[in-house]
């Protein structure tokens, strides 16, 4: 990708891990993070990488051991927003919830903390339009062309 791109590409890398998968389906979470970070650093792309995960152990370890990395906190639709950052223990760079329960109030509360809001995975035109109206900072979608189309329509 780097060799054929005309501009510097940003990477959003998800570390998929969970407690009951440690050393069965993937390395122990801290070893997993170390492997990913070493690979990123070997390619000299650290400044263009965001690491995301649902596994708060990964995010906490990343924050403590590699504080220069941009961190995205993934949460599913069943997560209680009221104490979410207390559970993590710090404010991530990005709050990335399932879009289904996202509200204008939540977006504004998070952005007041200087955290970007980038929901996932928003695919239908109707859902993309609704989420854009909330004032999010970005959208994760399987159809970026749809997001671009709706953004271009607003201009």
For each predicted feature, which ranges?
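Short loop-to-alpha-helix "cap/lid" segments that border enzyme active sites
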Residues: 2-155
């Amino acid at each position: 990708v780097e060799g054929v791109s005309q501009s510097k590409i940003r990477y959003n890398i998800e570390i998929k891990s969970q407690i009951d998968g440690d050393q069965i389906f993937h390395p122990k979470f801290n070893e997993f993070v170390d492997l990913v970070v070493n690979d990123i650093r070997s390619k000299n792309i650290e400044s263009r990488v965001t690491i995301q995960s649902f596994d708060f152990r990964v995010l906490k370890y990343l924050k403590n051991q590699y504080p220069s990395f941009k961190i995205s906190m993934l949460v599913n639709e069943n997560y209680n927003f009221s104490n979410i950052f207390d559970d993590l223990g710090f404010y991530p760079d990005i709050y990335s919830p399932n879009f289904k329960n996202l509200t204008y109030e939540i977006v504004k509360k998070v952005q007041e903390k200087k955290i970007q809001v980038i929901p996932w995975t928003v695919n239908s035109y109707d859902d993309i339009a609704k989420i854009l109206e909330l004032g999010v900072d970005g959208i994760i979608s399987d159809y970026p062309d749809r997001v671009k189309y709706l953004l271009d329509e607003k201009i």
